[in-house]
């Protein structure tokens, strides 16, 4: 099992380089991804041990802020967020390896994107370790274009269909349901793919699906960035982007499993919260003007069948 974990780690660290390099090619000023390698000390007072590399870009003309973060951690006991629906895992040691990214563009016409790909092994030090994969990618537009959502979902479907034709409808629905702000009765964006507890096939089959899915993120996102990054925008557009970013913050702090897991398990707070946007605003009881571009967004981000 250790060999398989290391193989996935090697894939993720290479993927991190591929993604940051591809994004930097679209940046028009001197902003670059900065590498912040870290290691948790292996001492008794540390609940979580391990290491990682958080790559951050800030202040770009295209990417106002972005993080592509790798981590490999282990602990003596899974936190409550990981065992709430799987009580049989309570008290088990674990290893978790993953890559998580969030890209916050400066231009309100370029959507925010998020992706995460991970493996968990519970009881890795026992004769019967329990493994599963999780991950996916989702898109959060502020001023949406239907062709962007169609391209995003078509890319997702193509990858899923290559492995299992039941995956796309199942993981799309899961994504729609997961990225939902219950307290607002709003969806975060136009979705994509979300899956967890993936071990329905052999390890190699699941590994191949997850790595193909991870490799397809750039195919899904880069054409949208290239198409929208030079659209002119006004302060009104920027203000609405900042307002909608507030919803992003609310979701990450209240509902996101990865954030909650990281904080509950004693993870590296600076890396966990690096996905937060550089700026966001909240307005009391604000409502978009009827018939405005802003009002249309709320109809657009409801779940729908993007691929006819």
From Swiss-Prot:
One of its GO terms (biological process) is protoporphyrinogen IX biosynthetic process. Residues 248-283 are annotated as: Important for dimerization. Keywords: Cytoplasm, Heme biosynthesis, Metal-binding, Oxidoreductase, Porphyrin biosynthesis. Gene3D superfamilies: Coproporphyrinogen III oxidase, aerobic. PROSITE patterns: COPROGEN_OXIDASE. The record marks 183 as: Important for dimerization. Its cofactor is a divalent metal cation. The active site is at 114 (proton donor). It is an enzyme of class 1 (oxidoreductase). Its main location: cytoplasm. It catalyses: coproporphyrinogen III + O2 + 2 H(+) = protoporphyrinogen IX + 2 CO2 + 2 H2O. Substrate binds at residues 100, 116-118, 266-268. It is found in: Cytoplasm. It comes from the Bacteria. Its EC number is 1.3.3.3. A divalent metal cation binds at residues 104, 114, 153, 183. GO terms for molecular function: coproporphyrinogen oxidase activity; metal ion binding; protein homodimerization activity. Pathway: Porphyrin-containing compound metabolism; protoporphyrin-IX biosynthesis; protoporphyrinogen-IX from coproporphyrinogen-III (O2 route): step 1/1. Pfam families: Coprogen_oxidas. GO terms for cellular component: cytoplasm. Involved in the heme biosynthesis. Catalyzes the aerobic oxidative decarboxylation of propionate groups of rings A and B of coproporphyrinogen-III to yield the vinyl groups in protoporphyrinogen-IX. Homodimer. Belongs to the aerobic coproporphyrinogen-III oxidase family. This is Oxygen-dependent coproporphyrinogen-III oxidase. It comes from Francisella tularensis subsp. holarctica (strain LVS).
